[in-house]
A protein has these predicted regions:
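Conserved C-terminal helix/tail region of periplasmic/extracytoplasmic solute-binding proteins
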Residues: 14-17, 145-198
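Short helix-initiation/N-cap motifs at beta->coil->alpha
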Residues: 23-37, 67
Length: 198
């Protein structure tokens, strides 16, 4: 909830409502991916969709994140996908598996070939499977400017339950940018406070 956030939402509004680069609901009935259906000229997505696009026979290219007004680039990387529940019956074994998977580059590469995700291990990202591929190269370049999602308790709920719903209301024209940011902050603060009590 800041001037920078307001600037982003105002630009987003301009793209949607003045420049008409996208219309809400346009992808309805297209399986949620108008790009894959050949109805949208570009998309903002991650490496996990590349295999689907190849299988669909799309002729596509990939570029890096757009730069902000100061020339900065930013991306978010995972960080909450691997967890061991407190009451797991095999917590030690799960931890050994996570270490095996994430600390040995060859294992990370093989998993990424299956999942379509980028490896968490930078040495794995330097493997020829990624480094010699023009498309994956764009995603490996993101390692130089990407941040890792916060491990603060409640963070993913702030994103999914506070921020995204408010952004959706904003782009639908139901609330103003200022209201969206204020509501997201208020709800997010509540979620974080509740998570801190657990």
């Amino acid at each position: 909830n800041s001037e920078a956030g307001l600037t982003v939402l105002e630009y987003w509004n301009k793209l949607l409502n003045e420049d008409k680069v996208y219309q809400l609901g346009f992808e309805d009935g297209l399986g949620g991916d108008g790009f894959k259906a050949g109805k949208v000229a570009m998309t903002f997505n991650g490496p996990w969709v590349l295999e689907q696009y190849k299988e669909a026979g799309l002729n596509f290219g990939v570029i890096g994140q757009p730069k902000g007004p100061s020339g900065d680039m930013h991306a978010m990387m995972g960080g909450f996908g691997l967890a061991i529940p407190n009451k797991a019956k095999h917590a030690d074994e799960a931890w050994e598996f996570i270490k095996w998977w994430t600390t040995q580059p060859e294992n990370g590469v093989e998993f990424c070939k299956i999942s379509g995700n980028m490896p968490a291990n930078k040495a794995a990202a330097e493997d020829p499977y990624f480094a010699d591929d023009d498309v994956f190269e764009v995603f490996t370049e993101a390692y130089t400017y990407a941040g890792i999602r916060s491990k603060v308790l409640g963070y993913s709920d702030v994103e999914g339950l506070a921020l995204i719903p408010q952004l959706q209301k904003y782009v639908a024209g139901e609330i103003s940018a200022e209201e969206a940011l204020a509501n997201a902050q208020s709800q997010g603060d509540s979620i974080l406070a509740e998570a801190a009590q657990q």
